[in-house]
């Protein structure tokens, strides 16, 4: 009987979460042409005032990581490709659809001053983001596994931290139901973490993930800070002020931290599934 309930919940949680997001999509009106292009910058760097800015934000961080992926003899990221590539593209497809939808309804958008060209309604750099950014974080994930295999602190706190985050994500969604970005992102993050916490017993990677998420905040703050206008006349990524929490860390909406948690946790979870399957 208990096993039947477990199987039932295993399917109910993702289905219920998807239904919640679809219900929100159908019932919530998003005000169009309401994107905020004026964000107080902390400083101004004239080099960033170029249509290639978003491209440069991919190129300069990713080239060294791509190089180390093939030539670092200890990390050897290329040996994980059979598990990494399916994880990257499966989750990228989900987020491409999500990103395109949010752009089309006016939850966020992209400033044409800072990207090269579009495919559909997304800049080419945005399409690439869902591959290059998780790949870069995976490089850190793998490097920490190799060079710092003992992860005592995060492994010790991962269960209470996971439970606290699950409650926090769903609470944020509940109390901000009228904000599309906040509500749907928090539902997604809470649901994927809850599902993994309850049912994925074979690949308990949460401690290692929390560690790399903490380390990854440094490059995230740099790149996302630039994308959200910390050093430019206008942001690269512009948001509808009625659809997010309205709280920013410098220029970065707090919702972005939840969004990136959902993206990176999902990629890592699927990567660990494929790695476990191939082993």
Model-derived segments and their meaning:
Residues 2-279:
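Aromatic-rich, lipid-facing transmembrane alpha helices and their immediate juxtamembrane interface loops
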């Amino acid at each position: 009987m208990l096993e039947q309930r477990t199987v039932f919940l295993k399917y109910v949680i993702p289905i219920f979460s998807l239904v919640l997001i679809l219900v929100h999509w159908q019932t919530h009106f998003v005000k169009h042409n309401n994107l905020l292009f004026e964000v107080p910058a902390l400083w101004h760097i004239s080099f960033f005032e170029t249509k290639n800015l978003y491209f440069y934000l991919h190129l300069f961080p990713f080239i060294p990581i791509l190089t180390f992926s093939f030539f670092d003899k200890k990390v050897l990221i290329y040996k994980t490709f059979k598990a990494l590539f399916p994880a990257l593209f499966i989750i990228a497809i989900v987020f491409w659809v999500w990103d395109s939808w949010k752009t089309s309804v006016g939850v966020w958008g992209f400033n044409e001053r800072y990207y090269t060209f579009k495919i559909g309604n997304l800049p080419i750099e945005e399409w690439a983001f869902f591959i290059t950014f998780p790949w870069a974080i995976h490089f850190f994930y793998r490097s920490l596994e190799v060079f710092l295999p003992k992860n005592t602190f995060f492994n010790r706190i991962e269960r209470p931290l996971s439970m606290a985050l699950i409650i926090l994500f769903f609470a944020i969604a509940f109390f901000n139901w009228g904000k599309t970005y906040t509500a749907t992102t928090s539902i997604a993050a809470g649901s994927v973490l809850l599902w993994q916490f309850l049912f994925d017993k074979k690949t308990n990677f949460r401690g290692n993930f929390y560690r790399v998420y903490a380390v990854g905040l440094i490059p995230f703050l740099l790149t996302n800070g630039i994308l959200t206008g910390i050093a430019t006349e206008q942001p690269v990524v512009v948001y509808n002020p009625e659809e997010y929490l309205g709280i920013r860390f410098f220029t970065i909406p707090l919702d972005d931290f939840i969004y990136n948690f959902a993206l990176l946790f999902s990629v890592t979870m699927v990567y660990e599934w494929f790695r476990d399957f191939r082993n």
